[in-house]
Amino acid sequence: MERAIFAGGCFWCMVQPFEEQAGILSVRSGYTGGHVPNPSYEQVCSKTTGHTEAVEIIFDPSLISYSDLVELYWAQTDPTDAFGQFEDRGDNYRPVIYYTDERQREIAERSKQSLQASGRFDQPIVTSIEPAEPFYLAEDYHQGFYQKNPQRYAQSSAIRHQFLEEHWQ
């Protein structure tokens, strides 16, 4: 099994696309990239801990590759917005691909270069590619949020889904 960590704005919206893929064993919402051990949601939202909301994905590389996950990641984000994603603003919502080893870093860098060269976006691809740091699991009420709160999830993800349809479909 392997691990991937992606930050793409609100973690509620990043779970379902990955959970639907064959070879995914788990997708958990959490916080990473900051300087406070085991932060709470309230601390992360205060924008004082340095953390981003992210998802940790455990996957079977014999069924789905890390490269496939990176491609799916791009299609869930606006890679031209470094200051948050959609209606969620600030460093805690910035887009980041966190790599766990050199191979993941190389795959992510090549994929980013390929996306930039594709001309899909008029602006530069600004998603960061950074080494993985400790991943702290978010509170239980954040786990599987789209399943527990479908109406609130639909409302909170509407702007994202509109962008994705316009730019990735």
From Swiss-Prot:
Has an important function as a repair enzyme for proteins that have been inactivated by oxidation. Catalyzes the reversible oxidation-reduction of methionine sulfoxide in proteins to methionine. Pfam families: PMSR. Signal peptide: none annotated. It comes from Streptococcus equi subsp. zooepidemicus (strain MGCS10565). It catalyses: L-methionyl-[protein] + [thioredoxin]-disulfide + H2O = L-methionyl-(S)-S-oxide-[protein] + [thioredoxin]-dithiol; [thioredoxin]-disulfide + L-methionine + H2O = L-methionine (S)-S-oxide + [thioredoxin]-dithiol. InterPro entries: Met_Sox_Rdtase_MsrA_dom, Met_Sox_Rdtase_MsrA_sf. Keywords: Oxidoreductase. This is Peptide methionine sulfoxide reductase MsrA. The keyword Acetylation does not apply. The active site is at 10. Belongs to the MsrA Met sulfoxide reductase family. GO terms for biological process: protein modification process. Its EC number is 1.8.4.11. One of its GO terms (molecular function) is L-methionine:thioredoxin-disulfide S-oxidoreductase activity. Gene3D superfamilies: Peptide methionine sulphoxide reductase MsrA (3.30.1060.10). HAMAP family: MsrA.
